A protein has these predicted regions:
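N-terminal secretory targeting modules
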Residues: 1-58, 62-228
Length: 228
């Protein structure tokens, strides 16, 4: 008689032509348990849950200019909610051909971990950059609807910096009226945010002595944020 048929321990449920996200955790699946629980909470009606999951994607040139992450972000935001392109550095070499956000800037001294000289690693942020403004420096992000979905507007726009002295900034949302902000010196990472239905936001540095800037964000208040 023929030997009994042995069922495979794992059956790949990915249909032809699809690449699934693979969990490389151990067999107990404990490594990603908290992440899966956070995804479940995106649909929670509990007011104590903010229902927000932030995912940071680190990679090589395959994620440059959102090549891979644009599709991943769109898929996750359609499934779990959310909007906006997430974190963007103050300046970027790929701003001219990144299709997921319109990014313009001027008046900045940019420093990256890949620089051969004049880079102080003690000053770098999570992206491996820091940016020093000249007077009148500005940076603007504008959503777009021609590439991927849920990127034309966001609900919260933020700018991140570290200031040893007072800092004075101006925010202009949807090319409307300017709103002025001033923050006292701090030893911690600082953030200023504006909220609403935001299609564009422009930040201008009015004065920022001894201040390092790191990046911006266009986020939703619930669902998925995926940073490239």
């Amino acid at each position: 008689p023929l030997p009994p048929v042995v069922k495979p321990a794992f059956v790949d449920t990915c249909r032809a032509g699809m690449t699934c996200i693979e969990d490389y955790g151990d067999s107990t699946r404990c490594g990603m348990a908290s992440f899966y629980e956070a995804l479940d909470r995106t649909s929670s009606s509990n007011p104590e849950d903010d229902g927000l999951v932030r995912i940071a994607v680190f990679g090589d040139s395959f994620i440059e200019a959102d090549i891979f992450t644009a599709d991943l972000r769109e898929m996750l935001q359609k499934r779990f909610g959310g909007c906006g392109v997430g974190f963007v550095t103050i300046t970027s070499m790929t701003s001219g051909y990144r299709p997921t956000v319109r990014h313009t800037f001027g008046g900045w001294s940019s420093h990256a971990v890949t620089d051969s000289v004049y880079f102080d690693k003690k000053k770098q942020g999570i992206s491996g950059h820091y940016f020093i403004p000249r007077e009148g420096a500005y940076v603007e992000l504008r959503g777009q609807s021609k590439y991927a979905s849920l990127l034309d507007t966001c609900q919260r726009a933020s700018i991140f910096f570290y200031n040893k002295d007072s800092v004075y900034l101006t925010a202009r949302v949807n090319r409307g009226e300017n709103k002025n902000y001033s923050l006292a010196p701090s030893g911690d990472l600082q953030k200023i945010s504006v909220e609403g239905r935001i299609g564009s936001v422009r930040w201008t540095v009015d004065r920022a002595d001894s201040t390092l800037f790191y990046g911006l964000a266009m986020d939703g208040k619930k669902g998925i944020i995926l940073d490239n």
